[in-house]
Amino acid sequence: YQSDAKPAGVIDFGAQDDKTKAYSPQNDYYYIPEKNFVVPAGTEAGGAQFNHPLKDGKFDENPAKVTGNNVFSEKPSIDDWYETMKLNYGYDLQNGKNYLDPVPPVWTKMRDILVFWANKGVDGFRCDVAEFVPVEFWHWVIPEVRKINSNMVFIAEAYDPSKYANYVSYGGFNYMYDKVGLYDALKPLIKNEANATVATMRKVIQSQEGGLSNHMLRFLENHDEERLASKGFAQKPEFAKAAMVLT
């Protein structure tokens, strides 16, 4: 990673990493030492109709980095997040150890990025797959950003309901995605599937009692899911009016 727009004095991610080590508490990335990254078979950059001299199925990354979805191999599959890189928030994932004191270098780099945008007037952040980032980091960084704006809103995209309460109470998030919960309970009802039941919806609502419900961001559409009026969902938006009352 090499930024062409970073403020003076800012160090790029990975610029000071020891790439001979698979893991170091001081590294920003996780590495596959002495292995070159291999572009997954079937990759069709730009689509089949796109042609370019640089479209040769190769990408120079040596040593290969671990992917954002934790693939510790230089040969991720086409279904892996091979175009992303796992950031080191202080956890040695392969050996089950953590190094959180002193604060890992990635923590301060990410804080500086968030503060940069907060100082420009951004008043909220939607954090992609926030549960892949240790809750200890959020507990530390969210108050740091709120020094700029005490009303800063943090929304977590997360898919593990068992983590919701902790990411709100300890992590400091304002809202958690209610996808694996109310959305997944409502969709079968809207589609009138044979096994759809209000009992599933009731179970979700009861599991969010005790104040958690106020921190759930509910929806019937987002960029990852089917459009409401699509053939695979409600077919007609009118069929989802009742569900909209709950979301």
Where in the sequence are the language-model features?
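Substrate-binding/active-site clefts of carbohydrate-active enzymes
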Residues: 1-109, 113-116, 164-165
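Active-site-proximal helices and loops of the catalytic beta/alpha 8
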Residues: 2-27, 31-35, 39, 112-115, ...
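Generic, ordered loop/turn and secondary-structure boundary motif
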Residues: 51, 82, 88-90, 117, ...
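The substrate-binding groove and active-site-proximal loops of carbohydrate-active enzymes
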Residues: 83-106, 123-132, 185-192, 224-235
